[in-house]
Amino acid sequence: MSEEEKAELENMQVESEAKTSENDQTIDTKVDVADVTTHVDEDLDNKEEALDFSEDELSDLDENQFENFDESKIGREAEEPTIYNLPTFKKKQEPNTIEENLEVPRKVRKEQKPRRRRGKRSSTVDALNDELNELGENEEEVLTEQKQLDPTLAAKKELDLQMDAVLKPTRTKKRSNEDNLEQMADDEVLRLREQMRLAALRDAELNSEQLPATEKLKMLPLVDAVLRKTHLYDTILDNNVLDSVRMWLEPLPDRSLPALNIQRSLMDILTKLPIQTEHLRESKIGRIVLFYTISKKPEPFIKRIADNLVSEWSRPIIKRSANYRDRAVGVASFNPEVFQTRRRRDLAAAESNDDAQASRTGRTVIPRSIDSRYQVAPRVRLNPTAMTIAGRMKPADTEQVRKLKAKMKAIRSKSSKKSGVSIEGRGL
């Protein structure tokens, strides 16, 4: 064997001996610990047996033996030091945390202060004071946190707060602006209503004094401009401006109607306003519009507008639909003989009335138009099923259809031919 191999074998033997010695030591320590625990358990059992007195031994004692007992003569063991007598050890603090720890005892003292019991009012005051103190303490904590932050973090936090303040929605401002606009619209409409009422009263006074009533005409452009604003429709109806419109459309004291410009403008405005039944009940404008449909003084186009308004406003009252399909039309069967006899009778009555009136007045009578609006529809006598069957059975290849097809075929053949002369000389 070489010297190197011998050295390696010696090293391996030394390592194995060291490991065996360590194992023996660990086993010895385990045995010693087990012996100690057994001895401790035996001592505790002996003490318990010594302290365990039976009831018979205690009953044999005589109480008279302890009459002249003096406790001062008995030797006492030295009192064991309590926890409060133990020395205190303070941990070394860093200079950065000293300021934080100095503020803690102040807060603890504030919380440990006893509070006096008072009545209900004083308790509420105390609660408010406590809340204020807590808010102040929170603000102080925030300030201390800001001081402790690094300058870079503090600048970043301040920038974030500024961005949040800029991007915060301004709903309260928008709501306040909307309220201001609504208030301005209400003021404008109320002012206009009062001016219209005063103008109507002034024109009535001037007309009764036989003077020209021009107050409403002067104010008409302003009224027309305001009442035609679509965003003010609800405000106009809520503030009962229709009452002033009714006063403008009423006849004057001399029973004359207002100017034609006023009638035309206000009637057109009434057709565009979304008037409901409660608005008609409050303003009573339906009566004056109905008067325009009955009276003979208004112009025909004014009467037509009034008729349309009355029919539109009366539908919800009488519960009638505005759809033409839902309209109930009376139907009657047509009898030619009855129609001829009735027509002859009506013509004879009309001629006799015209002759009597002409003889009475001594002049000719102007013919007038007759109302051609019918209230009763004729009954349909055709059978739709028979018409469809006859149409299907009718032959499609009739003489007229054949001629039409031939004509169309000739037109197509002419259009398909190329214009110009061919190479062979065709088309010359």
From Swiss-Prot:
<keyword id="KW-0804">Transcription</keyword>
<dbReference type="InterPro" id="IPR051037">
    <property type="entry name" value="RNAPII_TF_IWS1"/>
</dbReference>
<feature type="compositionally biased region" description="Basic and acidic residues">
    <location>
        <begin position="16"/>
        <end position="41"/>
    </location>
</feature>
<feature type="compositionally biased region" description="Basic residues">
    <location>
        <begin position="408"/>
        <end position="417"/>
    </location>
</feature>
<feature type="region of interest" description="Disordered">
    <location>
        <begin position="1"/>
        <end position="126"/>
    </location>
</feature>
<dbReference type="GO" id="GO:0005730">
    <property type="term" value="C:nucleolus"/>
</dbReference>
<feature type="coiled-coil region">
    <location>
        <begin position="2"/>
        <end position="65"/>
    </location>
</feature>
<feature type="compositionally biased region" description="Acidic residues">
    <location>
        <begin position="42"/>
        <end position="69"/>
    </location>
</feature>
<feature type="domain" description="TFIIS N-terminal">
    <location>
        <begin position="243"/>
        <end position="320"/>
    </location>
</feature>
<keyword id="KW-0805">Transcription regulation</keyword>
<keyword id="KW-0175">Coiled coil</keyword>
<protein>
    <recommendedName>
        <fullName>Transcription factor iws1</fullName>
    </recommendedName>
</protein>
<feature type="region of interest" description="Disordered">
    <location>
        <begin position="408"/>
        <end position="428"/>
    </location>
</feature>
<dbReference type="InterPro" id="IPR035441">
    <property type="entry name" value="TFIIS/LEDGF_dom_sf"/>
</dbReference>
<dbReference type="Pfam" id="PF08711">
    <property type="entry name" value="Med26"/>
</dbReference>
<feature type="compositionally biased region" description="Basic and acidic residues">
    <location>
        <begin position="70"/>
        <end position="79"/>
    </location>
</feature>
<feature type="region of interest" description="Disordered">
    <location>
        <begin position="346"/>
        <end position="365"/>
    </location>
</feature>
<dbReference type="GO" id="GO:0072686">
    <property type="term" value="C:mitotic spindle"/>
</dbReference>
<keyword id="KW-0539">Nucleus</keyword>
<dbReference type="GO" id="GO:0005634">
    <property type="term" value="C:nucleus"/>
</dbReference>
<comment type="similarity">
    <text>Belongs to the IWS1 family.</text>
</comment>
<dbReference type="GO" id="GO:0016973">
    <property type="term" value="P:poly(A)+ mRNA export from nucleus"/>
</dbReference>
<dbReference type="InterPro" id="IPR017923">
    <property type="entry name" value="TFIIS_N"/>
</dbReference>
<comment type="function">
    <text>Transcription factor involved in RNA polymerase II transcription regulation. May function in both SPT15/TBP post-recruitment and recruitment steps of transcription.</text>
</comment>
<feature type="compositionally biased region" description="Basic residues">
    <location>
        <begin position="107"/>
        <end position="121"/>
    </location>
</feature>
